[in-house]
Amino acid sequence: MLYLHDVWVNWFEGEENGYNVCHFYEWRKDDTIELLDQVPLLKVDATLYHYIENELLELPQKMLEDVHHKAYIRKNHERLQQEYCFVVTDGKGIIAIDTIGYNVPIRKSRLIPRQEQMVYEMVENVQAEKYEFQVEEIEKEHHILSPSPFIMNGLTRKERQLKQLLFMALDQLHTTKNTAEIRYWFTEWDPSAYGMVQHMEFEDIWAKLYEEAKTGWSEKHEQLCERLVKGQPFFEKLWEMENEQKVN
């Protein structure tokens, strides 16, 4: 068993999509950083690595047994044993996992660059561990509240968060089935479409708005998001939290 020591982690909880587990350069001052005093390191094949990074599904039982009680976190000068905590790599991607006692990867973190380099060097000539696990034959279904990586590629942490907020607001707008309202919002998005949307039905306008808004991120996206969330306390709070951030 390989081990890493003094590993800094920034846990992202309940994230099924790896793109929301931020790399070191996107960590923020107000993120909670923890120190793993000792953590086991596993090398697995690319299929299992992708499954762990991009799902919230059961981990192989043998893997859990291999790492059981082998990690320690350093808190307030105490060394606390962890149930199932480990770093896993396929030789390309690297992610730290803490199940907080469950059998699914509840918490995920990237490593700092120096420790990533250490992982690459440690596993370079190591064979991948073989673990049996069930992969769903059905391709993972992405939807408006769990966008595909393709839609999020190239965006900063702040842009990803705001784009997901925009999608949440659009999803809520879809539940209203209010044709006059969706015509208004599409005209806000594209003023030149005013005449066209007067002759379209709710579902068609909403689908067109979503289809156009899901590509990229721009000032136009940000303005639509800001206007859509106005007057909705929960969404407004999320908007304010992101706009307090100066970077990322």
Swiss-Prot record:
Belongs to the UPF0736 family. It comes from Bacillus cereus (strain ATCC 10987 / NRS 248). It comes from the Bacteria. It holds the Pfam family DUF3603. InterPro entries: UPF0736. This is UPF0736 protein BCE_1296.
